[in-house]
Amino acid sequence: MEKLDRYLQENFDVPAKNPSEEAQRRWRQAVGTIVKNRRRRFRWVPDLERRSLDKAKVRSTQEKIRVALYVQQAALIFSDGAKKKEYKLTGDIIKAGYAINPDELALITSKHDSKALKMHGGVDGISIKVRSSFDHGIYASELDTRQNIYGVNRYAEKPSRSFWMFVWDALQDMTLIILMVCALLSVAVGLATEGWPKGMYDGLGIILSIFLVVMVTAVSDYKQSLQFKELDNEKKKIFIHVTRDGRRQKISIYDLVVGDIVHLSIGDQVPADGLYIHGYSLLIDESSLSGESDPVYVSQDKPFILAGTKVQDGSAKMIVTAVGMRTEWGKLMSTLSEGGEDETPLQVKLNGVATIIGKIGLVFAILTFLVLLVRFLIDKGMTVGLLKWYSTDALTIVNYFATAVTIIVVAVPEGLPLAVTLSLAFAMKKLMNDKALVRHLSACETMGSAGTICTDKTGTLTTNHMVVDKIWISEVSKSVTSNTISGELNSVVSSSTLSLLLQGIFENTSAEVVKEKDGKQTVLGTPTERAILEFGLGLKGDHDAEYRACTKVKVEPFNSVKKKMAVLISLPNGTSRWFCKGASEIILQMCDMMVDGDGNAIPLSEAQRKNILDTINSFASDALRTLCLAYKEVDDDIDDNADSPTSGFTLIAIFGIKDPVRPGVKDAVKTCMSAGITVRMVTGDNINTAKAIAKECGILTEDGVAIEGPEFHSKSTEEMRDLILNIQVMARSLPLDKHTLVTNLRGMFDEVVSVTGDGTNDAPALHEADIGLAMGIAGTEVAKESADVIVLDDNFTTIINVARWGRAVYINIQKFVQFQLTVNIVALVINFVSACIIGSAPLTAVQLLWVNMIMDTLGALALATEPPNDEMMKRPPVRKGESFITKFMWRNIMGQSLYQLFVLGALMFGGERLLNIKGADSKSIINTLIFNSFVFCQVFNEINSREMQKINVFRGIISNWIFIAVIAATVAFQVVIIEFLGTFASTVPLNWQHWLLSVGLGSISLIVGVILKCIPVGSGETSATPNGYRPLANGPDDI
């Protein structure tokens, strides 16, 4: 992440939005004052000390690589007389037919050894020695042999943590360690006073409870670690284009081998070390490897390309010379540990809550222990005197201390920040199945609060399956149909005009025509390039003949800033010609001539220019993207390094490209509006095209504003403040305009903004936004690295699904906090009050440990994994600054706590009289009944917590098997504890009337919940709602 922050700062002047590590370190120290298990609380976030070491390693390696390159350049001057290391060919290499040692080949590229490369015959010689062809690549049948000799393209990874390491981490809990000591003391004293086996029951019960807590915790954490590992592997899946078996195909970087011919384009991350074959204007950013911020120009004179670097501009083909651990990038990556995730905002907030509650619990625990001890001493002093002590007295004090420590175990809600991780991990897994790869934990959480989505048009709102629908040429507009267009154009334009059109299409394109296994031709490239090239092929044009007839001298690839692509070609007659294709308004401004029907270049009059603009607007009003194609004859002595000219062009044609709106987008936009989320379309297209698509999607409303990027950029700060909230469409925009829009929405109005992007130049906006969403199909690797979420199917409806799950995460954690705080309050108060009044705690250490497991691990599993429902998208997003614990939650917490305290207090102080329980074991029966009723109150309150405002808490419960399984397991184990484990848990078996009473008292919590939800409270809104969002209704919702 540090490399990306530096890249954005140096190239786009965009500061990092994440907190510094020093701030994170101070925060952890602050919340670490009351921590049961610091290692577990901060498990899923980075080890800051290790991360610092990793950064030092990266800087050291970068410095070594940089110095090595300088030294190597100097050493070449003096290397003639030096004795060179000889690399021998092994029998396996010779048998396979290769003629170069793997280590020698790897060093040629990594050391930029031009002399060694020349000695081997240059790039051509290397390709012969590794049995590869620039045109046909390698044969797939050779993959195993090449991997055995030259290696696989994988880096050595540190082994995953075993299950027993998670068990060890769970045992680091300081309060569990203290309880273990208490249990051992209890066993020792018990054996001395009561003998075997009765004397060890109390201590053994605590030990078994600790074992159960540790094992459940370790299993939960281990499963989460496997899930994160799986998601991490998904993040590393990158696909690239190679030429194999004579055809271009897409493969995983892990399947790459030495000899492969790789196609590189803007935004790609170089997957392996290689040598440049040919290309156009290739600029490589090596800052991730060498630390140098200036891009490196790669050509046939300097053909070395290193793994881990990024293509900043241009395109090229390279031959792979080293993979995996034979690359410098592989060696660097293998030394680094897993980075971990920075704490999410919700984790930070809940860490603070857990610490505050922990301090309160510590005070209650100390007071409870002191009260119990003082009462014991008073009673002892009044009976036998303080001078006479027995071993049973020591056992009593040990049990008091164990109870106090257990109160801390229950009071410190260690499960709060961990529940966030569990809920996020569950959501990330589900989103992965729904075509959304969450790269950063915080993104899933933050997306639930998004109030604005700034989305691209092409491929996100539309299908990205483009076809040329209309064409204007020689002042004639034609609708395109595959069967008749060739004949229709021949009837209105001359063959020379048609030939010029086809030359412009075939030469000025980044798409390629490739042959599949069955011999059929397929066009590869961006959707726009494919559409135009397929149109040219539909005109019966001979792509291969045109490709062979002309030589490309210079290519300026399309990017979102220039909005055009230019190519300089050398014609067979010795002359040169520029072809330029791009945004209609930009290309038209560069033209002062046009091609007539006879193929002649004629001056472009103002009337003709106006008619052409009307044609462009007409195409755009039909929701067609428009592109112009033009050419310019140039002198033969032109400077190859000069940029393409910006004037003097002759207009050839205008293409109207159709890109239909994706099915379901209109409904998704409607869902956003009902959820209080504003959708703003930001596109580089013509404003009329953008408005037509926006209206079709339901984005542009009657009071919405559609504006062009240049006009938006020219606005003053005050004008922008008045305008920005009403902007729904921004056309002809640059990446900088998108970044400005995001910055102002966040800065001026405190909006939570999500942004989609696919190009390298979208990196600043993706990084600036609260949630960056990169396209998985059309997106470059640079865009993906800048993003928080990768939308694998490039579909807008998938983005809405991310928002839906984000809201589910936030609401689920609120449910869990409501449930846990209720348990905390009741457990603390009932034990403290009982200690003060009666002189004993009704809930023992073993019982409290079981309650803690219900509350922490099982409660988190049940409530933090609730799937989203449609109601979540009918309420406004949570605004920045709103309290996490709302008034609705406090109403439910206090109401349920008062009810439970009343019931348990009645049983404690009047249970024997009210229930007519008599006999020697009446006290044990009452305490067991209190414990059983307390647990069933939590079981039914867990059901209550499924809905914080709605009365119907059973909606969708059948479909949530995790919740049902947790409730069933809790009830089943409670029966086992009461009926069969009484010796260890200090309980006695209950009759059916007492069981019915316990379940009945617990179930009344459901009725209490209905009554509480009928009590109106304030909405709890703490911040302004600039978009006019409607606050949630008070009181109960519809059932």
Swiss-Prot record:
Pfam families according to UniProt: CaATP_NAI, Cation_ATPase, Cation_ATPase_C, Cation_ATPase_N, E1-E2_ATPase
Membrane topology: Multi-pass membrane protein
Keywords attached to this entry: ATP-binding, Calcium, Calcium transport, Calmodulin-binding, Ion transport, Magnesium, Membrane, Metal-binding, Nucleotide-binding, Phosphoprotein, Translocase, Transmembrane, Transmembrane helix, Transport
UniProt catalytic activity: Ca(2+)(in) + ATP + H2O = Ca(2+)(out) + ADP + phosphate + H(+)
Residues of the active site: 456 (4-aspartylphosphate intermediate)
A cellular component term, taken from the record's GO annotations: plasma membrane
InterPro entries the UniProt entry points to: ATPase_P-typ_cation-transptr_C, ATPase_P-typ_cation-transptr_N, ATPase_P-typ_cyto_dom_N, ATPase_P-typ_P_site, ATPase_P-typ_TM_dom_sf, ATPase_P-typ_transduc_dom_A_sf, Ca_ATPase_N_dom, HAD-like_sf
First-tier enzyme category under EC: translocase
EC code: 7.2.2.10
GO MF annotation list: ATP binding; ATP hydrolysis activity; calmodulin binding; metal ion binding; P-type calcium transporter activity
Protein activity control: Activated by calmodulin.
Principal localisation: membrane
Stored PROSITE patterns: ATPASE_E1_E2 (PS00154)
Stretches in topological domain Cytoplasmic: 1-175, 220-250, 374-406, 846-847, 913-960, 1016-1039
Functional note: This magnesium-dependent enzyme catalyzes the hydrolysis of ATP coupled with the translocation of calcium from the cytosol out of the cell, into the endoplasmic reticulum, or into organelles.
The record's note on its domains: The N-terminus contains an autoinhibitory calmodulin-binding domain, which binds calmodulin in a calcium-dependent fashion.
NCBIfam families: ATPase-IIB_Ca (TIGR01517), ATPase_P-type (TIGR01494)
Similarity-based family: Belongs to the cation transport ATPase (P-type) (TC 3.A.3) family. Type IIB subfamily.
Protein name (record): Probable calcium-transporting ATPase 9, plasma membrane-type
Organism: Oryza sativa subsp. japonica (Rice)
Gene: ACA9
